[in-house]
Amino acid sequence: MKWLEIQVTTSQEAEEAVTGILYDLGAGGVVIKNPNDVKELAQTSEWDYFDPSLLEEGEEVKISAYFLITTDITDKVNFLKERIWELKSFGINVGNVKVEVSEVDEEDWADSWKKYYKPLKVGKRIVVRPLWEEYSPKEGEIVIDLDPGMAFGTGTHETTKMCLQFLEDIVKPGAIVFDVGCGSGILSIAASKLGASYVYGADVDEMAVKIARENVKLNGLENVEIFQSDLLKNFRGKADVIVANIIADAIIRLIPDVLPHLKEEGLFLASGIIKDRFEEVKERAEEFFEIIDMKEEKEWLSILMKKKG
């Protein structure tokens, strides 16, 4: 299938606003190429390998949006230009805007993001390696092979990174781990490779379940079971660790149901909490749990809890 690619070159400041306009116009997908993201990672120890040419991209942001080819595409492009121009009236510096339109195959845009997804070291030992990249692990490193497809969880997002860092410290040999809202399966796979005896991962989304199962198979793991479930609904038994990297509303709904599924000395790790919702989540969590540790990165928080008493 052919799609129409509309690529907008704009400023760092206007990135979020322009992306919102493209989604409002009905974009079927958006790829954002922001050189600052690359530079930020390159200055840390988290990205062991990257293409140095990515550092030569300048300061402009390129936002590519993909639309089904229709007769009104000219109207969409004109409307887009008008909306971007209007951003100036709100005091947003849009930079030297350029709008380019081209036809692309579905396979091309679906895979275009892969060139920017490289092996990533998270925490002390875990390295997330995309399926299409070569990587030679250093001594003591734990490599997770991953093809995230359309499921959430590549290791690059702050919420996933914080979960992986916590799991390095709390998953003990022989542990039973529940991964609620498993997405790509990255946390389930990490728990297994960190020594868990058995891991149960579930997601409400059928596509995520399919992708997670494929990633478990890709890593050659036989002690990870992936299934479909709305939060803890289809889980059985108790776990030493329950991890949920989901949105704040889902965490609030999940919290009371964690207790009967958690062993007496077990730990509950909740992530995906935006700063603006933290107090709300914290208040609900403290009705049932004692918060023993927290991590914060940019606008996201992760909290580690144990049963009260």
Curated annotation (Swiss-Prot):
SUPFAM superfamilies, per database record: S-adenosyl-L-methionine-dependent methyltransferases
Catalysis performed (reactions): L-lysyl-[protein] + 3 S-adenosyl-L-methionine = N(6),N(6),N(6)-trimethyl-L-lysyl-[protein] + 3 S-adenosyl-L-homocysteine + 3 H(+)
One cellular component term from this protein's GO annotations in UniProt: cytoplasm
Signal peptide span: none
Subcellular location: Cytoplasm
Primary role: Methylates ribosomal protein L11.
Protein's name in the database: Ribosomal protein L11 methyltransferase
Gene from which the chain derives: prmA
